[in-house]
Amino acid sequence: MKIVVDENMPHARELFAEFGEVIPLPGRQMLATDLQEADVLLVRSVTRVDAALLASCPRLSFVGTATIGTDHVDKGLLAERGIPFFSAPGCNKYSVGDYVLSALLVLAERHELNLGAMSLAVIGAGNTGECVAGKAEALGMRVLRCDPPRARAAEANEAAQFVDYQQALEADIVSFHVPITRQGPDATFHLLDAAQIAARPAGQILINASRGEVWDNQALLARQQSQAPLRLVMDVWEGEPEPLQALVPHTELATPHIAGYSLEGKARGTWMLYEALCRQLRRTPRQDLQSLLPIPEVREVTPGQSADQALIKQLVHLIYDVRRDDARFRNRLGVAGSFDEQRKHYPERRELSSLQLKGPFAGAALARLGFVCQPD
């Protein structure tokens, strides 16, 4: 069995070698000729799995993406050809949640904000959106959920928990967690369009850790060059891997599509595909996820006080401070190929669950943020 994998997919060789030959290739440069003898194709979001890529792959019997989103895969074409397809829903939801939490705490300190007195709207209340919502609620924030497909499918009593898009946009902070879709009643391409951008109040915080095309980046640039700019946190960009460079200086925080890049998140995505292939071949998995992860540098802390916003910031940034990624991105802006290079060589980053908190102040609020808590 020949298994073609994105070269940047962590742990692919050690997990899939038991099935056959593992062939790592650059994700953005995969060609149909690379798949002529492939039985399994494993990709990330940078590879378009379409008719061109699948032009000559008679042996292909399994396609997987180690990502939550699947907009880069022609699922209809795979179904027509009878090729099973698997993704990794929720694999990096905790990582993205940690990213948003870290960003919120940076902005709160920078602009002297009391997050517990603010509202946050989650656009897209799926796996990732719900994770972000839960962390925001743990901070004491009032959370609004906007997810039209879920609202339509919900029972009447559950549908009441959702708000429409216009209501969501009135929140103090709006965080986007949707796939990119271009057609249908819930299309998300330029969901935040020029009209919506122009209507936003000055200083409103907007966060995008979903897909770059969900926001109209040119319209954002025009707004940011006005006398009433917004506060933007951007992990994703139109035109990746070539972001609109002129927009970057007008953001609060800017990063190269790495919100979901924790060690756990990346390993979990590969692991979910490994489990799927085991099921497909009716094999029992020989390896477990935890065995793939190194021992964290910081494993245990005993807080000396109750969890106020300042302590939460210290604990979160002990594990992940988004400002490091922001500084690296800005320093390398304009360097050819740097967007993908930063993703390929991303520093080791753990999720909040890698830190165990002990003692009388290791309470429920910290556990809801994602820490492992063992109160006395």
From Swiss-Prot:
GO terms for cellular component: cytosol. Keywords: Cytoplasm, NAD, Oxidoreductase, Pyridoxine biosynthesis. Signal peptide: none annotated. Pfam families: 2-Hacid_dh, 2-Hacid_dh_C, DUF3410. NAD(+) binds at residues 147, 209-211, 235, 260. It is found in: Cytoplasm. It catalyses: 4-phospho-D-erythronate + NAD(+) = (R)-3-hydroxy-2-oxo-4-phosphooxybutanoate + NADH + H(+). Its EC number is 1.1.1.290. One of its GO terms (biological process) is 'de novo' pyridoxal 5'-phosphate biosynthetic process. Homodimer. This is Erythronate-4-phosphate dehydrogenase. It comes from Aeromonas hydrophila subsp. hydrophila (strain ATCC 7966 / DSM 30187 / BCRC 13018 / CCUG 14551 / JCM 1027 / KCTC 2358 / NCIMB 9240 / NCTC 8049).
